[in-house]
Amino acid sequence: MSMKPRRGTAAGKALILAALLTIAVPEAAHAKTADVTVVSPGPTMGPPTPFTGVSSHADCPDGLVSGGGADQAIGSDEMSNGNHVMGMVPSADGATEYVDTPGVVGTDAAHWMAFGGSGSRSSDAFSTTPYAICLSSNLIRHTQVVMNKAQGPSTGLSSKLVTATCPTGTVLIGGGARTTPASVGSLKPIASFPTFNDADHHFGAIAAGDGEHDPDAWTAVGGIGGGRGADNMTYAYAICSTDDIDLKHVSTTVRFTEVSGPNTASTGQTATAGCTRGEGRLVSGGAAISGGNVTTTDFGKATSGGPHLNGSFPSDAAGTPAGDGTANPSYWTAATHSGGSPSQGSYSDVWALCLDVRHGHKP
């Protein structure tokens, strides 16, 4: 039997390879991407006197702000009880705040502001360092900032909770909290966290829990010690995508950690949570000092009026703040402080919000 050469075999393989490349190249060209870079210009010193505040800002040279935070230096003597975070919020220009009518207050914010307050004590050691998380994505190209606000807390040892909710058809990627004025020394935000505008989460009063997917709102809680003030305000900010993206390509996952303390006077505590490789990029985070169980019950403040935040920032697994220019950090850390009085039953809470644009929506 004669053996004839199998003509066209090489050509056939070439055609098959060309066809596969035709399919693969467009798939690669249309792959969804998201990367973040930390921008932090260093500390702003102050406040230099009691009952005053200081502002600082970090600015994204490329991309948009998806979240941000602050870290404070407080010194080591008894004056350290005074410095506290007064706000961590998105900004249109790094100098002004969104504080007017609630609703969608801005688009494509690329700046982050961090505020510190001195309370009744001040020190030359006080400072506040801002952190902006700058997102670059070929899917989320535009963002919108939603603000909500409420008057209070206005009476001693009380709190005020307010929630900002993303518009339908958008994705929550971050948020922030703010209280004013700094002249009321014991007023401060004691919580800033992702949540859901649904009955299961009491429309923002219960925080998103570890492993929950796709929160759509951000809650801020203002707390006050012995001070009072009729003009006190608490602001919540949600940073959301626009509604022109295909939600099937996007999912977010919450990672949460709660640790006991600080319980004794003039002490601090930290808590850290992080995103795993399969959950996508860390795009924002939140922090609280609370009475505990914040993901199963309505948020409750710590028992005394002194507990406050000294930081909420991107970090490594050990809680060391991410440096300026860090690409794609995986962890978020909360730094809390008891103030000048014991506060038994206090807890430190931290949230990391992880964005996945490759594997899409998770049930």
What function would you assign to each model-found segment?
Residues S2-A31:
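Secretory targeting and sorting signals
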